[in-house]
Amino acid sequence: MAKGQSLQDPFLNALRRERVPVSIYLVNGIKLQGQIESFDQFVILLKNTVSQMVYKHAISTVVPSRPVSHHSNNAGGGSSNYHHGGSAQGSSAPQQDSDDAE
């Protein structure tokens, strides 16, 4: 199972570490926006004005607002499968879109 997450974990960890704003599209078409606070094998904690626990099985696509380097050999990347966010810095929170899926 670790082999299946060899791309997912470094990608999500880079987004978390660099506090990159992301849009997460769910399989039902809903778009969530925020920053990845932490994640594990099954869920992602997405922080905007509140923290939301989003189950990975409900996610279709994760779209970063800017390109990120997510190579697994980055310094400080580590090999842990569980990543927890630190304290949030004083950055402006991304706004949540209320796009209606039609």
Swiss-Prot record:
* Gene Ontology terms describing biological process: regulation of DNA-templated transcription; regulation of RNA stability; regulation of translation, ncRNA-mediated
Q: What Gene3D superfamilies would the database entry show?
A: 2.30.30.100
Q: Which GO terms describe its cellular component?
A: cytosol
Cross-referenced InterPro entries: Hfq, LSM_dom_sf, Sm
Extract the Pfam families matched here. Hfq
* Cross-referenced CDD domains: Hfq
> What segments bear the compositional bias annotation Low complexity?
70-86
Q: Which keywords describe this protein according to UniProt?
A: RNA-binding, Stress response
Q: Name the PROSITE patterns for this protein.
A: SM
Q: Which family does it belong to?
A: Belongs to the Hfq family.
Listed name of the protein: RNA-binding protein Hfq
Q: Which GO terms describe its molecular function?
A: RNA binding
Q: What is the lineage of its organism?
A: Bacteria, Pseudomonadati, Pseudomonadota, Gammaproteobacteria, Enterobacterales
Functional description taken from the UniProt entry: RNA chaperone that binds small regulatory RNA (sRNAs) and mRNAs to facilitate mRNA translational regulation in response to envelope stress, environmental stress and changes in metabolite concentrations. Also binds with high specificity to tRNAs.
Q: Where is the Sm domain?
A: 9-68
Transmembrane stretches in the record are none
Taxonomy, superkingdom? Bacteria
* Species annotation: Klebsiella pneumoniae subsp. pneumoniae (strain ATCC 700721 / MGH 78578)
Task: Name the HAMAP family for this protein.
Answer: Hfq
Q: How is the subunit organization of this protein annotated in UniProt? A: Homohexamer.
Residues annotated as region Disordered? 63-102
